[in-house]
């Protein structure tokens, strides 16, 4: 099995606590409201903490598909959240799982700095393609910006 790491960092004008609430605490309800392609997020097993399995149902190319996410860490105090895609349509044939480690911290002017590490655990020596990496980054950036936009548009959130 190969492991390929990618890191990304971005900033937001939204404070870490408000952004974490949208990205993690309320995400199961908020994401389907904000992202048209995502129909639902439901807990299949667990209570929302580490070890929980979530099913994310989405529409892609006119087809309904799903991903299974396993929650690896929920740290509400330090604004950290880790999960892995462990099944469903979001995994390329050459990948066993994709893990995401995210952390929000105080950024400039009362905003946030978001750090993300993505690990592809591949079958054999296969490496993720540049297309897979770029596609995953684009989806992640889109989700982040959509939830950030929701928080900015709803000051009482």
Curated annotation (Swiss-Prot):
Q: Which SUPFAM superfamilies match?
A: Bet v1-like
Q: What does the record say about tissue specificity?
A: High levels in roots and not detectable in hypocotyls, cotyledons, stems, leaves and flower buds of untreated plants. After induction, high levels are present in the vascular bundles of leaves.
Q: What induces it?
A: Upon contact with the plant pathogen Pseudomonas syringae pv pisi and salicylic acid.
Where is the protein found, in the record's own terms?
Cytoplasm
Provide this UniProt record's keywords sorted from A to Z.
Cytoplasm, Pathogenesis-related protein, Plant defense
Output a single Gene Ontology CC term carried by this record. Answer: cytoplasm
Give this protein's Gene Ontology molecular function annotations: abscisic acid binding; protein phosphatase inhibitor activity; signaling receptor activity
Q: Which Gene3D superfamilies match?
A: 3.30.530.20
Which GO biological process categories is it annotated with?
abscisic acid-activated signaling pathway; defense response
Query: InterPro entries per the record?
Result: Bet_v_I/MLP (IPR000916), Bet_v_I_allergen (IPR024949), Plant_def-hormone_signal (IPR050279), START-like_dom_sf (IPR023393)
PANTHER family for this protein: OS08G0374000 PROTEIN-RELATED (PTHR31213), STRESS-INDUCED PROTEIN SAM22 (PTHR31213:SF55)
Give the UniProt family note. Belongs to the BetVI family.
Protein name from the UniProt record: Class-10 pathogenesis-related protein 1
Record the organism: Medicago sativa (Alfalfa)
Classification lineage: Eukaryota, Viridiplantae, Streptophyta, Embryophyta, Tracheophyta
